[in-house]
Structures are given as structure tokens and as C-alpha cells.
Amino acid sequence: MSTEAATYLLSAVAVGLGATLFMDLWALFLNRTFGTPLANYCLVGRWFRHMSEGTFSHTSIASASQKHFECAVGWIAHYVIGAVYALTLVLVSGNWLAQPSLLPALLFGIGTVLVPFLVMQPSFGLGIAASRTPNPTQARLRSLMAHTTFGVGLYVCAVGVRYVVPVHA
């Protein structure tokens, strides 16, 4: 792999990590300002830890047995997933990282909400698009807001990376 290709891929990973942090900081702001509940990434870790035992779907992830290091696994998975999403955007969008624009990042970020809606929430016992939660509309809007913020973060971080590292497609 050439140095230029490695720089490009590492820049994409940096964008993903930064966008995930951007999303988390926005969630923290909403929590501190309006009392909006924070996502529980420990439950994501619990889900991944149960996978090693062959359990991929739960009636209620909150009622599933706790696992050692589930919080660490959940937070690490959260950031790795953010990096993988950014790599995906960069690899399918051609020259976007060298010339970032908001619309592709925003649309991609919004599109990533399909993963929790169609994979994670059903696997957690929450139903497709949180249909089994006490307030599905509120849960859906929170997911959509988080992933929209991730999309904005992709753009903001790509612009930032461009100023630190010369990125060429």
C-alpha cells in the first residue's frame, strides 16, 4: 500500500472517530441542557459479548445477563463502527474526502440509522425501528437526530482533517 493510500484511509478513520465524538458531544450537550437521556453503549457491549456465545437476539437486552467489560466493549464498538461508516463513505464517494461537502455526509449519516432500526433494535428486543418501546416515535426521532448529527460530524471532521493532512483521492 502506498503512503498516499495509507494516509487517505487513516484520514477516513480519523474522520469517523471525530464524527462519532461530535455526535457524543452533541448528545452530552442535549443531556446537560434538556435532560435528554444518553445512549447506553454498555448494552451494545453486552450484545457483542453475548454474540461470542452464539446469542444474537434477545427478548430484552437490558434483562440479558451482564458480561465482563461490556461497557468497554460497547464504547469501543461505537467508535469502531463510526470509523467503519466513515471508511465506507470515503470508499464509495470517490473524491469526497479530498473535497468534502455537507450533502453526501449528511445523507450518509442519516442513512446509517437503518442499522439500528433494522439490526440492533430488533436484536435488543425493541422491535424494528423501536416499535416495541413505550414511545416508538420518540425513540425513532432520537436515533434519527443522533445519526443526522453524525453526518454533520463527518463533514466537519473531513474539513478539519483536510487542513491537517493533505488528502488526495
Residue ranges and their predicted role:
Residues 1-169:
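Juxtamembrane/disordered regions of integral membrane proteins
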